[in-house]
Amino acid sequence: MATTETYTLNDFVGDLDRITREETSATRVTERVAPLLAQLVRNPRSIPAEYLRSPAGQRGRYILHRAPKFNVTSVVWRPGDRATAHNHETWGVIGVVENEIEETRYRVTETGAGRAKLEVASVTRHPTGAVSRLVPGDEVHGMYNPTSRDTIEIHVYGRDLAGLKRRRWDDDGTEKPLVSDKYLNC
């Protein structure tokens, strides 16, 4: 059994592969993955250093592992970076490697004509080591780095978000299409 100091990205990917073969429920997958991601983010040395920084002028977004049933990415949020309310179309688990991030969860009620009522369900400031779970039906959130330093996270999703058609909402509830950019390293 790997300890926190020895639990590596390769260990994590192996565990994810096993879990996603054993489980079909998004809730069960995220319940089992969350403590493992918490262990991984406590050992940032296991993530290649080039995937833990943002390029000048943009958010860092790197693929660490791509598999048929899951993807592992690193995301580097610059100070002040914000993602408005958006969905994922899959389960997800997010862990903070360094610094902190503010996550706002929303309940969305479609009102028609490309609009929705967004109700804030919770606002949580996640410190280093914290893990957040997303499951369909409870996977609309916004993210914000309120600090003066980069925030580094590991994101795990049940689908590849690059090119996936999703939705985002402005603060006034206007719905807009969202297609995630490609990763910076592929």
Can you say where each PLM-predicted feature lies in the sequence?
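Short acidic-glycine-tyrosine-enriched beta hairpin
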Residues: V108-V140, K182
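Conserved double-stranded beta-helix
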Residues: S148, I154-C186
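Conserved short histidine dyad/triad with adjacent acidic residue
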Residues: T73-N87, P136-D138
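Short, conserved beta-strand element in jelly-roll/cupin
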Residues: V76-R78, N87-E103, V156-R159
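N-terminal leader/capping segments at the start of a protein or of a new domain
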Residues: M1-R42
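A short glycine-rich, His/Asp/Glu-containing loop-to-beta-strand
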Residues: E50-P79, V131
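Ligand-binding loop in jelly-roll beta-barrel domains
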Residues: V135-I154
